[in-house]
Amino acid sequence: MRKLALSDEILMKVDKPARYIGNEFNSVMKDTSQVNIRFAMCFPDVYEIGMSHLGIQILYDMFNRMDDVWCERVYSPWPDLHEIMKQENIPLFGLESQEPIKDFDFVAMTLQYEMCYTNILQILDLAQIPLRSRDREDGCPIVIAGGPCTYNPEPIADFFDIFYIGEGETQYGNLFELYKKAKADGLSREEFLHEAAKIEGLYVPALYEVEYNEDGTICCMKPKYDDIPVKIKKQVQVDLTNSTYPEAPVVPFIKATQDRMVLEIQRGCIRGCRFCQAGMIYRPNREKKVDHLKDVAAALIKNTGHDEISLSSLSSSDYKELDELITFLLDICKEKKINISLPSLRIDAFSLDIMQKVQDVKKSSLTFAPEAGTQRLRNVINKGLTVDDIMNGSKQAFEGGWNKVKFYFMLGLPTETEEDMRGIPELANDVAALYYDTVPKEKRAGKCQITISTSFFVPKPFTPFQWARMYEPSEYLGRAKIVNDHVKEQLNRKSIRYNWHEAYVTVIEGILARGDRRLCDAIVKVYEKGGYYDAWTEYFDYDRWIDSIKECGLDPDFYTMRERPLDEIFPWDFIDIGVTKQFMIREWETAHKETVTPNCRMRCSACGAKSYGGGVCYEN
């Protein structure tokens, strides 16, 4: 019988001790004498958020189907336990075995958000693994990173031995085979990493050198050896239908942030929103066959006991077999009183019939993302959404019995003017007025409630807006104030609620998103000063970040306030995502002409993703 890593005394001291004990329903236990590879799958945030992440569930299931691999889960300890583990010298452990992960073969992290970078160091520190790759000796685990943040791995390059660029289903088997052979042949850590760098999609940062110009921009980046690639090619699982998927995912003991079954219906997006990194890095769009999804949904319901199923996709409305899938789900879910969640709906593709069936009893609020307050700016960002689309979709919703609508917008987008900012509350006011004009008083479900939320735009790598500048926190807050003041001037202001994102976090996120390798030292400084859980408002300290960056001889404005010239070499230019830089430049220029590029089903825009040989590129 396994022994818990934490004593009862410690568990009674900390918040939500169930975060740390493992043994949840559908978790996997194995005999360590029967496996060759022990793999720690880490999420650098709290348990409840990490347990909501589909990517970890997919890889956990895939690895544990391999007879000689045991994959365990690790989440960032909450600050209360962090302090105890440091004081009592308790090494970070895997949930399943409760054994220290410093003794595992691999420690991997999925990186979803730049503000979790200090938690990378927290995990390594608590695990008693050297923070920097160069300080790890032959007995240390191989430390790997994957996920969307690895599309610019440079600000965290010092902390990882390997970055896995792309979708995890494709190359881990080859990496494991290489590792077993390297162990059998007695290869050193350095020799193994050299061989790993030859596997397509794997980037070993220690084997690449970066040279800088006098102005701080990158001059060049080159491999140290001739037998490793100059460009790292993103990995894509072209056939999603026949790839691995967890039909019996781990069910947490405590409520997770997304406490539901997740059914991935497609990957990628046919839309080309110019601010959206996910829409670019997950190209080409690939759909799963509906009959397969029906089988998976039935298995999830049987194996989990959750009372809600969510369809995972960047744009659910664009899944071609959505009607058939929803009809099937309604049939099997109604009897079991299971709710169906449809995130990522486009207001122009809004299906009242589907939504009325899904929410035929309880009319929860509907959420849409126009992103910009005027048609001009929506054209700039390639949202492909008109005022008529928004008003017609809202009218259908009101006629269907809804009275609560949430709209998401961004402030600080390229070319934004005060007119665009003022357009946000004006649009909300028009939608509220439409409710009172459309729904007779006796049929109203209550007062109309329009919630508008604004985040501040952060330029991300591999988007057409990767050249854009950012602003000081005071400028962002000034833009939010313009929106807030104009809300108060609207005729239907009592029906409008406005909230906005934290401006100071936005600036640091922007620095990390487009940063270079020189920022590694700054991240270490932030952690050494007590910074971690920076994604959480109560633990974030803007001055600590800015001071640490400056102490490393770097100028924060260099990373945020500049609009980049088109010929600048980016820290991430050594990665090949299929979508070409020429396409990005064309889209950047098209944005400034306020011109819309059609979606992938309407017309191929020759972005380059067709090179992967599948998906929407080959539908016609």
Map each language-model feature to its residues.
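Radical SAM enzyme core and accessory elements
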Residues: M1-M29, S33, F39-M41, E489-N620
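N-terminal [4Fe-4S]-dependent radical SAM core
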Residues: I10-A40, Y47-E48, P205, E211-Y212, ...
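N-terminal pre-triad scaffold of radical SAM enzymes
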Residues: F39-D45, F63, P249-Q277, I301, ...
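Conserved SAM/AdoMet-binding glycine-rich loop
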Residues: M41-C42, V46, M115, D295-T451, ...
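Canonical Radical SAM [4Fe-4S] cluster-binding loop centered on the CxxxCxxC motif
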Residues: H53, K255-D291, R603-N620
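Short secondary-structure boundary/capping segments
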Residues: I56, E88, L124, D158-F163, ...
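A short beta-strand-loop structural module common to alpha/beta enzyme folds
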Residues: D67-D80
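Glycine-rich beta-alpha loop elements in corrinoid/cobalamin-binding modules
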Residues: P77-P223, P464-D516, I523-E538
